[in-house]
């Protein structure tokens, strides 16, 4: 049976990658067409995130709004991702109109699960962890523009006390080296110029190679950089403990590795880091940052921060602010701590008033935003290498792209430049983007 599928995504880049694969597997195996509105779809899928409590509640709000599509149109409603993995049957109990519940490791089984739900008239739940089977069953890679995500591993084995990822995505499993290279090469042939290598703990990648050896992330980056057409490489998300000497050296040796790094620290307090079971101190984190900056002068460093963790004192928070100033973090993500069921941190006592936590979060965000503004302002007058990825959202008569440090630049130029690296002189720093003047094609542009 053919039909139309709509996919909505909550959460991280890994979820965006998985959502594309959900649609692709239905397109390939059942002839579906992907649509942009749930009202036009025969199958409506929600790919969920369980990192934050509010994100989890958004799932059931969304499902409530979708109930009418099932009643009026007979649409099949499916829930995937980390909330599905965590809640399983409980989703159907709370939202009985849901037909299919599947985890991150079972999205490749979607066609069969949808068939079973339709034929049997009852909900189908499969949130098992069939190890590498997901990667073995992925559809052929399909490019949608000059940038692409490629998942190289799944899961996390760090078990930080606040985090649900090991429980929702399982232990770390690395995708075979040859499979990763084949996917990137295929995407490059389709016009992809920048690839982001994905994993919950991506620098723990240990991909088996055909000769029996193991490839780490640093070596993988060198192989990806050697592929025709690839002009820029990013990776996310990293853990400081796994940030190896060879990966630091990759920043010195490989010019195609973008000068921008997202390396979550969560806190600058050694006490809080210990409670979080992060496995490192603030000084050890700072030492790695200094070595990375020495290997790649001018690199932009972004991070994640949790404010109001149980037991965090004002002194602990001040330690975090000092680390932020020492590193000079660029645009980063920061949240109030949200206890997740089943994690060790959920049982910790917490006596800090909510208004104190909110005030700390505001101070932290103001500090980081001020750093980010200074970085943007320092770029005015410089010439940046920009990958043009589409028309400008602000002005359809202009084009836009991203710099190495991940800033959006809008500038006048012909749409035929989409998919090309160009040189742009930055003329203005705006709150959420830059403006620039096109100078020409980049001399070192990857073959297009």
From Swiss-Prot:
Chain ranges of the TRAM domain: 377-440
Residues engaged in binding [4Fe-4S] cluster 1: 12, 49, 82
PROSITE patterns membership: MTTASE_N (PS51449), MTTASE_RADICAL (PS01278), RADICAL_SAM (PS51918), TRAM (PS50926)
Top-level lineage group: Bacteria
Catalysis performed (reactions): N(6)-dimethylallyladenosine(37) in tRNA + (sulfur carrier)-SH + AH2 + 2 S-adenosyl-L-methionine = 2-methylsulfanyl-N(6)-dimethylallyladenosine(37) in tRNA + (sulfur carrier)-H + 5'-deoxyadenosine + L-methionine + A + S-adenosyl-L-homocysteine + 2 H(+)
UniProt keyword list: 4Fe-4S, Cytoplasm, Iron, Iron-sulfur, Metal-binding, S-adenosyl-L-methionine, Transferase, tRNA processing
Note on how the cofactor is bound: Binds 2 [4Fe-4S] clusters. One cluster is coordinated with 3 cysteines and an exchangeable S-adenosyl-L-methionine.
Enzyme Commission number(s) from the entry: 2.8.4.3
Cofactor: [4Fe-4S] cluster
InterPro entries named among the record's database cross-references: Elp3/MiaA/NifB-like_rSAM, Methylthiotransferase, Methylthiotransferase_CS, Methylthiotransferase_N, Methylthiotransferase_N_sf, MiaB_methiolase, rSAM, rSAM_horseshoe
Domain MTTase N-terminal: 3-119
Description of how the protein assembles with itself and partners: Monomer.
Function in brief: Catalyzes the methylthiolation of N6-(dimethylallyl)adenosine (i(6)A), leading to the formation of 2-methylthio-N6-(dimethylallyl)adenosine (ms(2)i(6)A) at position 37 in tRNAs that read codons beginning with uridine.
Record-given protein name: tRNA-2-methylthio-N(6)-dimethylallyladenosine synthase
Organism of this sequence: Alkalilimnicola ehrlichii (strain ATCC BAA-1101 / DSM 17681 / MLHE-1)
